[in-house]
């Protein structure tokens, strides 16, 4: 199964594509869609077109996107919601089912700790996918979203606590201690 993860943003939208076979995760592609400094409609169109192109190029079976959180600034929340909507339209227009996860669920599934930092997310994504270099934070979050979806269902929320990722971490000489990755 191929999963496309999206980390929505008005200026930068991250994407990550992974293949899942049983418990094995394989990196396919990742990167960002950057919008031009332009009016809102142009930026949303860029996000929609970019996501639509990703769907055509990588032919994912499913997609996962981060839910919007209510920010201190309502205007920022509305803009993020619009960017997210443009990305969802690109996914749905390609015929994909779209799953949604909160940032807390994402971090819990990937790192085993719901309040993990961006650098912890990047490190875990790098290790789980055996990447030679560390992806940028937007691409790492999108790859993490795909990983989260791969581990969703009966295991979501229990991966760190019950050991869904513990064997993978142990093979890499890592473990989670007090919410932090330790070697």
Swiss-Prot record:
Active site as annotated: 7, 66, 138
Stored Gene3D superfamilies: Ribonuclease H-like superfamily/Ribonuclease H
One of the GO biological process terms: DNA repair
Catalytically driven reaction(s): Endonucleolytic cleavage at a junction such as a reciprocal single-stranded crossover between two homologous DNA duplexes (Holliday junction)
Residues that bind Mg(2+) 2: 66
Cellular compartments per GO CC: cytoplasm; Holliday junction resolvase complex
Tagged with keyword Hydrolase: yes
Cofactor note text: Binds 2 Mg(2+) ion per subunit.
Keyword entries, A-Z: Cytoplasm, DNA damage, DNA recombination, DNA repair, DNA-binding, Endonuclease, Hydrolase, Magnesium, Metal-binding, Nuclease
Compartments, as annotated in UniProt: Cytoplasm
EC number annotated for this UniProt entry: 3.1.21.10
Keyword DNA-binding appears in the UniProt entry: yes
GO MF annotation: an example: magnesium ion binding
Entries under InterPro entries matching the protein: RNaseH-like_sf, RNaseH_sf, X-over_junc_endoDNase_Mg_BS, X-over_junc_endoDNase_RuvC
Binding residues annotated for Mg(2+) 1, in chain numbering: 7, 138
Similarity remark: Belongs to the RuvC family.
Function: The RuvA-RuvB-RuvC complex processes Holliday junction (HJ) DNA during genetic recombination and DNA repair. Endonuclease that resolves HJ intermediates. Cleaves cruciform DNA by making single-stranded nicks across the HJ at symmetrical positions within the homologous arms, yielding a 5'-phosphate and a 3'-hydroxyl group; requires a central core of homology in the junction. The consensus cleavage sequence is 5'-(A/T)TT(C/G)-3'. Cleavage occurs on the 3'-side of the TT dinucleotide at the point of strand exchange.
Protein name: Crossover junction endodeoxyribonuclease RuvC
Organism the protein comes from: Burkholderia ambifaria (strain ATCC BAA-244 / DSM 16087 / CCUG 44356 / LMG 19182 / AMMD) (Burkholderia cepacia (strain AMMD))
Source organism phylogeny: Bacteria, Pseudomonadati, Pseudomonadota, Betaproteobacteria, Burkholderiales
């Amino acid at each position: 199964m191929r999963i496309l993860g999206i980390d929505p943003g008005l200026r930068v939208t991250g994407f990550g594509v992974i293949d899942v076979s049983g418990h094995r995760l394989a990196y396919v592609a990742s990167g960002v869609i950057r919008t031009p400094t332009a009016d809102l409609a142009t930026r949303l169109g860029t996000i929609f077109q970019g996501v639509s192109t990703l769907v055509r190029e990588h032919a994912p079976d499913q997609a996962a996107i981060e839910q919007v959180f209510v920010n201190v600034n309502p205007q920022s929340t509305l803009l993020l919601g619009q960017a997210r909507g443009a990305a969802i339209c690109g996914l749905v227009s390609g015929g994909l089912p779209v799953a949604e996860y909160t940032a807390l669920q994402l971090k819990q599934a990937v790192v085993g700790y719901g309040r993990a930092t961006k650098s912890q997310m990047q490190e875990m994504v790098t290790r789980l996918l055996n990447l030679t270099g560390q992806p940028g934070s937007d691409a790492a979050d999108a790859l993490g979203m795909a990983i989260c979806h791969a581990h969703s269902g009966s295991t979501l929320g229990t991966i760190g606590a019950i050991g869904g990722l513990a064997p993978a971490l142990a093979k890499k000489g890592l473990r989670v201690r007090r919410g932090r990755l330790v070697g």
